[in-house]
Amino acid sequence: MLNKITAVLQFGLNASLLLAYLIVFVLSIMGVIDSRYAFLLEIEGKQSVINLSIPIMLAFGMWILFYMFYFIWKIIVWTKNRSSSSNTNVNFNAKENFYVAITCIMVNVITGLCWMLFAAFQIYVFKNGHLPALDVLYRHYDLESMCWNSIVYLEIDYANTETLSQNCVYVNIYKKCIMCRAIVSDHEPTVFNQNYPVIIMGVLTILAVQCWNLYVQLKEMRHNIYMKRRAEAEKASYEHYCDIDYRREERESNSRLLEVVSEGRNSSSVVAVTHPPSTTSTTTSVSETLSSFIAPSDLSSQPSPSSHPSSPFGNHNEF
């Protein structure tokens, strides 16, 4: 519930900031086209006037264009995340959000610097800032002349007592004349010096919202980096456990194979132990067969026990 409330408030801040920046951007475009609507800053003691509408148009135009792209990209991301699983959601955001967040931070930093410079030089803007189309609303004279250019500084001629023109004022030892104006008064009211408290409070408020948005973007980028590292760690852990399971299965397979080989060797050893008696009987029969062949020749070579050797003196009996 708290996240939803925070998201709604953040959306409201972004919408209000977008509206304010859109107004500033439109006014800056009008100031570039027509100097009556330009934000002019007179350089004190010089004849030149700076049209600040051009850098304002570039800075805030870049902000608006980027945030239009950013909101469209957010819608695309939300649509893809809604139609996909949570894992795909994390991987998609972790992969794509980083570069968009970096660009968003850079754009917010640039616009924040613009507001900081405006607040820092507010006293200078208070004295020398002009917006001719709005300045005319704060004076009751010279309502037809909506401009502030063609500034001329002239030295005061003390020898000549000519009257001062209505479009000139004294500045130290010089006369400052605004050639495009019919009447100029000293310390002339402008939109900036007549609304100083409102302008400075508005600038500080927008700057605070801008800094808050910058903080939100940094927090979101850090969260996305954390989610990316977490997803990578989970992936590495999953691959590690898969590798462990694969090695365990490989060891179990090798163990089973070793058991099968051991059983085969044991069975062959049992067969080898039971075969020697038949080998002995075979050897005995072979020995008997060989003896049957060898015996007659041995008997024929031996003398017969029943015969007597003949004497060289002839056969005779002692008795």
Swiss-Prot record:
Pfam families: Arif-1 (PF06770). It comes from the Viruses. Residues 268-319 are annotated as: Disordered. InterPro entries: Actin-rearrang-inducing_fac. Residues 268-312 have a biased composition (Low complexity). This is Uncharacterized 36.6 kDa protein in EGT-IAP1 intergenic region. It comes from Autographa californica nuclear polyhedrosis virus.
